[in-house]
């Protein structure tokens, strides 16, 4: 008898970006993998070709990123329930805040069907230092949804401690994993020749100090603070040869273009848009900047470190898992433009020996986050779910 599992997220690009190894594991265990997301968003991902190549069954649902778009999400909830019942889904693995909300509400509605519900929290919204409204609303929502959760997966220590205070469904389990795991074959230091050729292709001069950020252009990713830091450096009168490139796209692109113009940075800032050659760009950087206000873990920061490129990061629960100030980069408050400006200056002033030492510390910092560790935990989780499904079929 075929086993069916549903992976539920908000946007279609999530699966091939972050869940490829999980899909392979599930298929190896004999599952037919269904994937439900809003296939019309984001608009800058062109087609479903990569999803089809993964061998999953694709389902469009009208899920919205915002939990406050009630009409769309109510419709999406009913679509998820219909999928579960039509395809006899035996387990579902939901991701993203709204995916986790709808997936677990669907699990509640389908309780008699015995669906095993897994939720990966890629960063609770009731984190330390979060706005009071987050603490009041999101914690209560998570506390309520926990009772319909069989397996809760978190990706940082702060969230793990918070998860232990929640009451899951009877027999529920909590796991901490190192994110989706680093692909060491893809993210590794470039050779000197690869770096020279890459910088030449990007139009970066040999004397330029090249900064890179990777991430969607939105409010949380906080790229504005880097622009403010660069403007401060420029106003100081001591203007070094700095180039800043942003890899990513999103709803803030027009705002970013406006801010770049207003701050007089058009000659040094480049919006590269969405790219699928991130290692080639990151490896050419002298440093990366990761200014997010909130991160569950922050793979962009880890990927930079894995390439031996130090990071100027915002302090948040995700970066605390792997960043050490003045060891593998520099860490500042997410709203501290002067701090980020200082970090850029300090990074530029490193001697060759200091830069070599920092590179070694970068590579050491990412060892606990290698993909093998994350895959081993997920394999154990999915195997336990499979055993549970098979026992239910046997005695059901």
What is each PLM-predicted segment?
Residues 257-273:
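Nucleotide-activated donor-binding/catalytic signature segment of Leloir-type glycosyltransferases, i.e.
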Residues 310-313, 323:
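Short hydrophobic beta-strand element within catalytic cores of glycosyltransferases
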Residues 325-326, 330-337, 346-352:
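Conserved acidic donor-binding segment of nucleotide-sugar-dependent glycosyltransferases
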């Amino acid at each position: 008898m075929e086993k069916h599992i549903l992976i539920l997220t908000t946007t279609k690009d999530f699966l091939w970006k972050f869940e490829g190894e999980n899909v392979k594991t599930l298929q190896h265990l004999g599952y037919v993998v269904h994937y439900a997301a809003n296939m019309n968003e984001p608009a800058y991902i062109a087609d479903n070709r990569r999803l089809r190549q993964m061998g999953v069954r694709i389902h469009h649902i009208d899920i919205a990123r915002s939990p406050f778009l009630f009409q769309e999400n109510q419709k999406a909830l009913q679509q998820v329930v219909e999928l579960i019942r039509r395809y006899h889904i035996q387990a579902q693995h939901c991701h993203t805040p709204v995916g986790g909300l709808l997936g677990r509400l669907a699990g509640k509605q389908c309780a008699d069907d015995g669906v095993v519900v897994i939720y990966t929290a890629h960063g609770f919204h009731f984190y330390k230092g979060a706005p009071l409204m987050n603490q009041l609303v999101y914690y209560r929502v998570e506390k309520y949804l926990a009772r319909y959760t069989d397996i809760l997966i978190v990706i940082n220590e702060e969230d793990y401690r918070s998860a232990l205070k929640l009451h899951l469904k009877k027999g529920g389990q909590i796991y901490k994993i190192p994110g989706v795991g680093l692909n060491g074959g893809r993210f590794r230091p470039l050779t000197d020749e690869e770096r020279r050729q890459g910088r030449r292709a990007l139009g970066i001069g040999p004397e330029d100090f090249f900064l890179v950020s990777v991430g969607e252009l939105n409010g949380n990713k906080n790229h504005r603070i880097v622009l403010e830091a660069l403007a401060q450096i420029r106003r100081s009168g001591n203007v070094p040869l700095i180039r800043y490139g942003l890899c990513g796209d999103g709803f803030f692109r027009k705002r970013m273009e406006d801010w770049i113009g207003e701050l007089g940075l058009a000659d040094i800032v480049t919006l590269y848009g969405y790219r699928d050659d991130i290692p080639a760009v990151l490896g050419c950087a002298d440093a990366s900047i990761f200014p997010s206000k909130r991160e569950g873990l922050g793979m962009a920061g880890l990927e930079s470190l894995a390439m031996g490129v130090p990071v100027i990061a915002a302090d948040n629960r995700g970066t605390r898992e792997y960043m050490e100030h003045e060891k593998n980069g520099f860490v500042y408050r997410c709203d501290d433009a002067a701090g980020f400006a200082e970090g850029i200056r300090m990074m530029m002033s490193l001697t060759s020996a200091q830069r070599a030492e920092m590179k070694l510390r970068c590579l050491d910092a990412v060892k606990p986050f290698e993909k093998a560790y994350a895959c081993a935990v997920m394999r154990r989780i999915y195997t336990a779910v499979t055993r549970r499904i098979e026992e239910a079929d046997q005695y059901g």
